[in-house]
């Protein structure tokens, strides 16, 4: 009986473990979390590469610091949207395409639309250990996630109200 339970547990866990090792599945999980009615922030960090996860964490700390320095009637320096999307509005449709993989790198196209406006973002993944991790997002409207984070942190927050 114990052997049967162990075999069943392996059959259940194995597909979950392999899901994180496919670039398309990683991107699908990322956008499912971003698009959720209440975005699931706990799901996202394990999908990110070490450098990107550190940059996102630093951006959040920086936002909190800016908020603490701002006057009560002043809006602090912050991103008013998901950092993973270029536009502040969430897309109405998201379709994850097939990855173009070469060695330890993979680009996955993500087609999105709001009304009649359509664009394709490209997600860069890199193998880290056994898993594929998101390293950057290049937005179809121009720019990329790493660039936005660098630009955001270049602004110097100062105490207001003298």
Feature map (PLM): residue ranges:
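Short, solvent-exposed secondary-structure junction/capping segments
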Residues: 35-67
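Bacterial N-terminal signal peptides that target proteins for export
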Residues: 1-6
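Low-complexity, intrinsically disordered terminal/linker segments enriched in charged
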Residues: 101-105, 109, 115-120, 136-162
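Hydrophobic/aromatic beta-strand elements that line small-molecule binding cavities or substrate pockets
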Residues: 121-127
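N-terminal signal peptide c-region/cleavage motif recognized by signal peptidases
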Residues: 13-18
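Short, aromatic-enriched amphipathic alpha-helices that serve as compact interaction elements
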Residues: 21-39
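Surface-exposed, charged secondary-structure patches
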Residues: 56-117
């Amino acid at each position: 009986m114990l052997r049967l339970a162990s075999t069943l547990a392996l059959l259940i866990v194995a597909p979950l473990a392999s899901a994180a090792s496919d670039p398309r599945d990683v991107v699908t999980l990322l956008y499912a979390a971003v698009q959720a009615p209440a975005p699931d922030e706990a799901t996202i960090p394990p999908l990110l590469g070490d450098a990107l996860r550190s940059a996102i964490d630093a951006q959040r700390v920086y936002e909190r610091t800016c908020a603490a320095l701002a006057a009560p009637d002043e809006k602090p320096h912050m991103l008013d949207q998901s950092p993973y999307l270029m536009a502040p509005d969430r897309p109405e449709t998201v379709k994850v395409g097939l990855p173009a993989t070469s060695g330890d790198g993979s680009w996955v196209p993500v087609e999105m639309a709001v009304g009649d406006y359509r664009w394709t973002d490209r997600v860069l993944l890199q193998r880290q250990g056994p898993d594929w991790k998101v390293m950057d997002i290049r937005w179809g409207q121009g720019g990329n996630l790493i660039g936005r984070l660098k630009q955001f942190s270049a602004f110097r927050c100062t105490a207001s109200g003298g």
